[in-house]
UniProtKB/Swiss-Prot annotation:
<comment type="subunit">
    <text>Component of the Mediator complex.</text>
</comment>
<feature type="compositionally biased region" description="Gly residues">
    <location>
        <begin position="84"/>
        <end position="104"/>
    </location>
</feature>
<dbReference type="GO" id="GO:0003712">
    <property type="term" value="F:transcription coregulator activity"/>
</dbReference>
<protein>
    <recommendedName>
        <fullName>Mediator of RNA polymerase II transcription subunit 21</fullName>
    </recommendedName>
</protein>
<keyword id="KW-0539">Nucleus</keyword>
<dbReference type="GO" id="GO:0016592">
    <property type="term" value="C:mediator complex"/>
</dbReference>
<keyword id="KW-0010">Activator</keyword>
<feature type="coiled-coil region">
    <location>
        <begin position="146"/>
        <end position="195"/>
    </location>
</feature>
<keyword id="KW-0805">Transcription regulation</keyword>
<keyword id="KW-0804">Transcription</keyword>
<keyword id="KW-0175">Coiled coil</keyword>
<feature type="compositionally biased region" description="Low complexity">
    <location>
        <begin position="63"/>
        <end position="83"/>
    </location>
</feature>
<comment type="function">
    <text>Component of the Mediator complex, a coactivator involved in the regulated transcription of nearly all RNA polymerase II-dependent genes. Mediator functions as a bridge to convey information from gene-specific regulatory proteins to the basal RNA polymerase II transcription machinery. Mediator is recruited to promoters by direct interactions with regulatory proteins and serves as a scaffold for the assembly of a functional preinitiation complex with RNA polymerase II and the general transcription factors.</text>
</comment>
<feature type="region of interest" description="Disordered">
    <location>
        <begin position="52"/>
        <end position="122"/>
    </location>
</feature>
<comment type="similarity">
    <text>Belongs to the Mediator complex subunit 21 family.</text>
</comment>
<dbReference type="InterPro" id="IPR037212">
    <property type="entry name" value="Med7/Med21-like"/>
</dbReference>
<dbReference type="Pfam" id="PF11221">
    <property type="entry name" value="Med21"/>
</dbReference>
Length: 208
């Protein structure tokens, strides 16, 4: 039973780790599509523009100008090659040794979202792993002793085990008493054999 409980604890830890990894993937690689407001509901909140990952700027309505949807820090953190598309040297990254805009991307920016097909495939894979781990946990729980017994049956079984334990303890004590008696008899026999072989050494010494 102790081994089953150890396996169960390990599976629970692994399940928690899988949940954390799954949520981390969904948050990191989702496309962050804006919510779709309900139709024919004038009181519904307007749809929000796509929010950049790790953004600290407040969300803006989807119809707001592009400049109001990003903070100055976010605008300055854009890829330099994208800022020069209006000029003649588009694709050149300042301060990057004449490299392209893709090569000079800011490493602090979050990774690009996965394609819908890749994202859906990995979602299914992560969900399958969670289901398999949950089934392992259910199996370990099902093989625990007494899992299908009621509380009254478990109490009755505990009392029976207590009686068996007391009986085994009484039998052990009886065996210990018998062993002590046998040891005492054996010591007497060995003493008699020693006297028969060597005689009374004290009496022999006094005669001399």
């Amino acid at each position: 039973m102790a081994d089953i409980l150890t396996q169960l604890q390990t599976c629970l830890d692994q399940l928690a780790t899988q949940f954390y990894a799954t949520i981390g993937y969904l948050v990191t690689y989702h496309d962050n599509s804006p919510a779709i407001p309900p139709q024919n509901d004038p009181t519904a909140a307007p749809a929000l523009a796509k929010i950049t990952k790790n953004s600290t700027a407040p969300p803006a309505p989807a119809g707001a100008p592009a400049g109001s949807q990003a903070s100055p820090q976010q605008q300055s953190a854009q890829i330099p090659g994208q800022q020069q598309q209006g000029g003649g040297d588009a694709g050149q990254t300042p301060g990057a040794g004449g490299g392209t805009g893709g090569a000079g991307a800011d490493p602090n920016l979050p990774p690009a979202p996965d394609s819908p097909r890749t994202f859906a495939s990995r979602q299914r894979e992560l969900a399958r792993d969670l289901v398999i781990k949950e089934q392992q946990i259910e199996y370990l729980i099902s093989v625990l002793p007494g899992i299908d017994s009621s509380e009254a049956e478990q109490e009755r079984r505990i009392k029976e085990l207590e009686k068996e334990l007391r009986s085994a303890e009484e039998d052990r004590e009886q065996r210990v008493r018998e062993l002590r008696k046998l040891r005492k008899k054996l010591e007497n026999v060995l003493g008699a054999v020693e006297v028969g072989i060597y005689g009374d050494r004290g009496a022999v010494a006094s005669r001399r």
